[in-house]
């Protein structure tokens, strides 16, 4: 079985830098997303009159599941407290139904890069990595796969590639490849709501039309939306019923899930109408900074309310410039690079949210000049 390269993988997500954390707290403005999360901000997303559930049944959990199923045009949806739990269990259901243990996905997908190969260790699933790690998934890459697969996982947008999205024609070709082989098609839509504006503008396709291509759709409530935690998987009622059993087997059917579901419903209603504005601001930022020497924006053009920005600078110098801006301007830019790609190449992730909207593209241009070492 081929293994994917470990080159240029994201830095460990949870290693702490206390000094940088304290410096970030001292800043009055934050560039990324919605700014720092706090208990008070998260608790404010949970209404006091929330109807509680018991073991995931009833209350706001059921309300959220029904809304997500309708939003995505599926028969049913299930709330799961963890995306890691949700996706591997969903793929397990597809594999069991097709009596094959092989699944196909891009080598930079979350299951391969961030989950300690849980699909393999817990579910005895075998992965076929499709295509080069640094390039988007393509139908041409899929044509090189010559073994039966139970399911094809497609991530929209591809986070580790800066929020890259395929054209509608390319996406349909990838789905058709799986359909022609009797494989299920699963959408890793952790940031699906961030993909919506691109497909609406470029291809006049709605969220319903995107979801209709897939057997099962996973969406996160904390990544692009800023909720407390958790996700939903939507699909056919029989598949979701099986997934519910696996949620229990994974320990995910806890006594009460209502705080997570209530927060999810709040941010879903609050953030979805803003996604088009986030996308427009991301495009404006990318255009504004494209002329800075030593900077490259990925993808180009930007296709979602996020992007990766490559700075041609050493890691120590980059950190020093982040610290200088924080101390002199009380502006927090990047805690760390998303990937350190070489001695003088740092790739950072810029997700656009409410906090980012407070910065004009011109101001961000000035900040990036300083981070790149080409400005005062």
Predicted regions and their residues:
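Conserved C-terminal alpha-helix-loop-beta "cap" of PLP-dependent enzymes
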Residues: 2-7, 98, 289-290, 294-376
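Conserved N-terminal alpha-helix of the aminotransferase class I/II PLP-enzyme fold
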Residues: 19, 26-82, 93-96, 106-113, ...
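Short beta-strands and strand-loop turn motifs
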Residues: 48, 151-159, 186-191
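Buried hydrophobic positions in well-ordered alpha/beta secondary-structure cores of metabolic enzymes
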Residues: 68, 86, 119, 152, ...
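Active-site nucleophile and cofactor-binding loops and adjacent substrate-binding regions
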Residues: 77-84, 220-221, 256
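PLP-dependent aminotransferase-class I/II
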Residues: 121-173, 358
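Active-site C-terminal subdomain of aminotransferase-like
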Residues: 156-160, 165, 206-294, 298-305, ...
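Catalytic PLP-binding core of fold-type I/II PLP enzymes
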Residues: 166-199
